[in-house]
Amino acid sequence: MGFKRFVEIGRVALVNYGEDYGKLVVIVDVVDQNRALVDAPDMERIQMNLKRLSLTDIVIDINRVPKKKVLIEAMEKADVKNKWEKSSWGRKLIVQKRRAALNDFDRFKIMLAKIKRAGIVRQELAKLKREIAA
């Protein structure tokens, strides 16, 4: 099976390194085989190394090097933010950020909830084993 995510104009990518880490950007122009011009509604248009980008499955329909206003409209029309949040990759990153923001007491409460859940599962499993044996 071949590649499905190509470096192309309109491809949405996740920045995986540097000061813009974790931001969704759109490739607006390909500079050469190693660099692309990327833009997002909340940042300046910059040249970025492709090694810093993780390409997503989301592609929006834009022309080469669009104005900021056109880019924002295209992103809203394509519903990029919701598509990202509904994707499994986006959900995993949201969960990671939420877990990283937990304090010690929150982690303690989660530990107690896991212990309680494991006890309930163990009781139900024992009940089913008794029914099968009888």
From Swiss-Prot:
Alphabetical UniProt keywords: Ribonucleoprotein, Ribosomal protein
Keyword Ribonucleoprotein among UniProt keywords: yes
InterPro entries: Rib_uL2_dom2, Ribosomal_eL14, Ribosomal_eL14_dom, Translation_prot_SH3-like_sf
CDD domains: eL14
One GO molecular-function entry: mRNA binding
Cellular component GO terms, alphabetical: cytosolic large ribosomal subunit; endoplasmic reticulum; mitochondrion; plasmodesma; vacuole
GO BP: translation
A Pfam family matched in the record: Ribosomal_L14e
Transmembrane segments: none
Similarity section: Belongs to the eukaryotic ribosomal protein eL14 family.
Name of the protein this chain belongs to: Large ribosomal subunit protein eL14z
Species in which this protein is naturally found: Arabidopsis thaliana
Gene (name only): RPL14A
